[in-house]
Amino acid sequence: MANSNNQLLKEIRFDWNKEEILEILNMPLIDLMWESQTIHRKFNKYDIQLASLFSVKTGGCEENCSYCSQSIYSASEIKSHPQFQVEEVLARAQIAKKEGADRFCMGWAWREIRDGKSFNAMLEMVSGVRDLGMEACVTAGMLTEEQAARLADAGLTAYNHNLDTSPEHYKNIITTRTYQDRLDTIKRVRNAGINVCCGGIIGLGETNGDRASLLKVLSNMNPHPESVPINSLVAIEGTGLEDNQEIDSIEMIRMIATARILMPKSKIRLSAGREKLSKEAQILCFQCGANSIFYGDELLTTSNPSFQSDRKLLKEVGVSFNKDFETREKTLSSL
């Protein structure tokens, strides 16, 4: 590897090139894991953030993302749902907090935020979640500068807007929104003073070069995204990518480790597809730098490890987390 470990530890960079990233991504696995854990332990406490994700409005999205069952272009049989009421969402957030989550993420299957009753309700939800003492994150598509400012005023902690894949591979995945649209949205979020949550998906038919290119875009953002969700494709029947093969867990470990090396202080979130990983693979991801997970039985329209299995896993690993949930019997799936 061109950079020694000492060089990697000296500074946080925002000028990575694709060749450097590919070299890291393709390192012998044991060396890669050692590099990433060394950096992780230097910059971060050894704990795991528990983030609960709730689909506030499900289905009917106007985008044609080929991996997504919520798209109007998908033939998937999902249960669409109109926007939940503010009180229902805050009740869900309250139970998530009691179960141990300290971030509550809310998702809307929209192309973009539109002013009006639904947006006003979103602002109430954000404010209500913050009043519970939790971090609040929203993912709802594109937004304007004014909307970003109003979300900031409501107390929004972070806005999620993933890049999905590399600029080069992007056109093979979605055509109803450009890569630049995504970057512009992220800029508006950042200009409003809201933390950026931005990551991608592996298993979309991309090459290793595409993965390096995606990580280049993310790691050259200054500052780095506050949190970086790394997802593996959950191939859903009826979507354009329903026949894609599952990725090997080693590929996820490599992606997590490389992201940690490139973005030492970001929360690297082990996200969709985690249910397919063995307990041992998840532990290796934590060792390599993953320090956040989505917590609860469902991620929008895909399944997730159960509350009980995550509680057991975290205890076995010995990481620190919010222990308020240990005496609770009600689970997120009981709502």
From Swiss-Prot:
The keyword Cytoplasm is assigned to this record: no
Cofactor(s) in the UniProt record: [4Fe-4S] cluster; [2Fe-2S] cluster
Top EC class of this enzyme: transferase
E.C. number(s) listed in UniProt: 2.8.1.6
Binding site for [2Fe-2S] cluster: 105, 137, 197, 269
A GO BP entry: biotin biosynthetic process
CDD domains assigned: Radical_SAM (cd01335)
Protein task: Catalyzes the conversion of dethiobiotin (DTB) to biotin by the insertion of a sulfur atom into dethiobiotin via a radical-based mechanism.
Descriptive protein name: Biotin synthase
Source organism per UniProt: Prochlorococcus marinus (strain MIT 9215)
